[in-house]
């Protein structure tokens, strides 16, 4: 068992669940709701209603892809590594390093997601060395 990859999977799955579940009570109401309340949107107009639904869909699809990626990392943590698996995990490590960097830069450190994504990235990278 690769503890680093399993750790990355647990952190990433937690991010995904928190992003969707907690967002239903706080984040979506505080962020997505505000965006959809801008005067750009007219709730009586069908296209604006569709835009609101798409914003909400994108929010939850993001959570779904993180949970799916966590499942892949958890699976890989329990199988024998091949060269292909190592390359895939290294790619994921870079992707989550970019998640961390963009989150840190764009929100200027005011949202803690950058640290969680950095943990996923580092654990994934270390996981490729532990095979």
Residue ranges and their predicted role:
Residues 70-76, 94-103:
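Transmembrane alpha-helical segments of integral membrane proteins
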Residues 79-81, 98-116, 126-131:
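Membrane-helix boundary connector in multi-pass membrane proteins
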Residues 3, 17, 29-32, 121-126:
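Polytopic alpha-helical membrane-helix bundles and their juxtamembrane interface segments
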Residues 2-26:
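N-terminal signal-anchor transmembrane alpha helix
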Residues 81-94:
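Structural signature of hydrophobic alpha-helical transmembrane segments
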Residues 59-73, 117-121:
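Core segments of transmembrane alpha-helices
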Residues 14, 36, 98, 121-128:
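Alpha-helical transmembrane segments and their membrane-interface exit regions
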Residues 25-54:
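Cytosolic, membrane-interface loops and tails of multi-pass inner-membrane proteins
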């Amino acid at each position: 068992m690769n503890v680093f990859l399993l750790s990355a999977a647990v952190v990433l799955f937690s991010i995904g669940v928190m992003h969707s579940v907690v967002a239903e009570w706080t984040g979506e109401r505080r962020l997505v709701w505000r965006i959809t309340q801008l005067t750009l949107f007219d709730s009586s107009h069908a296209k604006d209603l569709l835009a609101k639904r798409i914003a909400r869909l994108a929010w939850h699809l993001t959570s779904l892809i993180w949970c799916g990626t966590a499942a892949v990392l958890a699976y890989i943590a329990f199988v024998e590594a091949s060269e292909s698996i190592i390359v895939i995990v290294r790619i994921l490590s870079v992707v989550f390093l970019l998640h961390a960097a963009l989150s840190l830069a764009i929100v200027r450190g005011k949202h803690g997601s950058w640290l969680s994504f950095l943990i996923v990235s580092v654990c994934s990278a270390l996981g490729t060395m532990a095979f």
